[in-house]
Curated annotation (Swiss-Prot):
Name this protein carries in UniProt: DNA ligase
Binding site for Zn(2+): 402, 405, 420, 425
HAMAP family recorded: DNA_ligase_A
Names of the cofactor(s): Mg(2+); Mn(2+)
Gene: ligA
One Pfam family named in its UniProt record: Nlig-Ia
Residue sites binding NAD(+) per the record: 31-35, 80-81, 110, 133, 168, 284, 308
Organism listed in the record: Acetivibrio thermocellus (strain ATCC 27405 / DSM 1237 / JCM 9322 / NBRC 103400 / NCIMB 10682 / NRRL B-4536 / VPI 7372) (Clostridium thermocellum)
Keywords: DNA damage, DNA repair, DNA replication, Ligase, Magnesium, Manganese, Metal-binding, NAD, Zinc
InterPro entries noted in UniProt: BRCT_dom (IPR001357), BRCT_dom_sf (IPR036420), DisA/LigA_HHH (IPR041663), DNA_ligase (IPR001679), DNA_ligase_AS (IPR018239), DNAligase_adenylation (IPR013839), DNAligase_N (IPR013840), Hlx-hairpin-Hlx_DNA-bd_motif (IPR003583)
Amino acid sequence: MDIEKRILELREILNYHSHKYYVEDAPEISDFEYDELYRELEKLEQERPDLITPDSPTQRIGGKPLEGFKKVVHAVQMQSLSDVFSREELLAFDRRVREAVGDDVEYVVEKKIDGLSVSLVYENGVFTRGATRGDGLVGEDVTQNLKTIRTIPLRLKRDLPLLEVRGEVFISKKDFIKINEEQEAAGQQLFANPRNAAAGSLRQLDPKVTSQRKLDIFVFNIQRIEGQSFKTHSETLEFLKELGFKTSPGYKVCKDINAVWEEINRIGEERGEIDFEIDGAVVKVNSLEQREILGSTIKAPRWAVAYKYPAEVKETVVKKITVNVGRTGVLTPIAIFDPVRLAGSTVSRATLHNMDYIKEKDIRIGDTVRIRKAGDIIPEVVDVVFEKRSGNEAEFNMPEQCPVCGADVVREEGEAAYRCTGIECSAQLYRKIVHFASRDAMNIEGLGPAIIEVLLEKGLIKEIADLYYLHKEKETLVNIERMGKKSVENLLASIEKSKQNNIDRLIFGFGIRHIGLRAAQLLSENFESLDALMNASAEDIMAIPEFGEKMAKSVEQFFRQKQNRDTVEKLKAAGVNTVSFGKKKIKDNRFEGKTFVLTGTLPSFTRKEAEEIIKSFGGKTSGSVSKKTDYVLAGEDAGSKLQKAKELGIEIIDEDKFRKMIE
């Protein structure tokens, strides 16, 4: 096989299907088939690293966390827009435009996406740099994080010498809700709105975290270009589509300001139904020649304005407070109130987040409350109208048993969240199975989120253990759209293979609160079987030096639940290993008691590979340099850690020295 030819072919195939899926929303192959092609490319590139290029689909997610963001001076200033808040102000803008360029003016109206503005630079058709807007003159280099956004092409469909475009990075309303559910489940601070979530995700130092946040982008302007010219803005938008960009959705060319006003009203009526947050409508002069005449002020162009929609607040009465159990097991109180029309839709419920939120606002059943839509998306209770309180209102208390499965509900000290402890609670099953099948848990290849959703929808799995009985449903699986015989055979083989895992993977796969990979390994090393662990008390578990009371009680609480014990029995009946392989022996402990810190890029090791080698010799790794650090392993572009090591007199080694140490 000609490896170079096959690599080029695979890149072309993967780029085509990625565009069909992420930009056009019209997939032609299954997720499993895409993953198999991706893995083939990954394998070939590992064999021939000299053929890896920056625009390869495998290079979207960087291998190592960054130590900071470099500053970028924008070649073209990224200006903001002047705001208008009424029809009168819009008409005044139109008068100023016509006074400067005459009455023959055409406008383009676009939705104003409420996200984070970025610039993307392409050289000879390849994405080379991306930066945040910053103050408009200087931004931050976030190239590696932008590469994780699937709707940003790494290579254009035309090899233009130079192209710089501007776009808005955002998170859809649906994904924003999921992210906040995950934040809440992890006991972390919630994002106030999708814009904050997008900004926080794009500025993560670890691109792998960014890649999990489902960021998206709409590209809406050409900042500079070589090898092409245009007469109108609408022409540039169509050209950007041809290059492979996802552009401003549903823009409209308007012949006069009255048509502009009609379009603004239409967008305003529909904004509650759009799956991304908008904070207005942008009105732009279409003619690029007229734009040149109009020019700009220091901060904003004279040829465009942003119309901002007014916020709505309504009063209603809380009829009852129910409890929703999320995919992570967190119980969330929901206020049910008299239906009201708000921001384009009728709403009758709003999340109350947790008991701390309810107590802080003193919300009671029967209260008159004021509500609004945060960012025109999520209904929220602003406050209680205390002057309308009658004295007959009732306080709300969180249930002690899960309303879905009946398992115990617990609230750990220092946390706001109440959680269901049942592993097979149907409300949280999807997330549990995704985690159970993940690489660090049972490592079931081919069982990704999309396949799991299908299996749940078809009723083929109702609990984790059902995965190991799927072979009985082979004919049904083969007939499911986008799966096929080969995909099903591979999936079933992977499930069968996972039965032989050590129990540390199974323990981690259960998703027990506070039990990560290392904790699961320690439990496996200290208990000979899952039965022994299930019958252990918190005191028994705390005999492991690394285990504190919180971790030990979490394990005890988990295995105390009958449904969790039943799951273990069903797994055993299916042939899943529940006996420990014993403590992993370190053959060579030359690094015992030594702590390493890694910084920069190593020529031939990934950071994870180097860390695993250090641990295999009994050493430890740390993310920061201190007096307790023994060695700093430094590669190219080493950052502040290297400087701190020099200041503290820590021994600094390069890859060559490291190789000699492990020979």
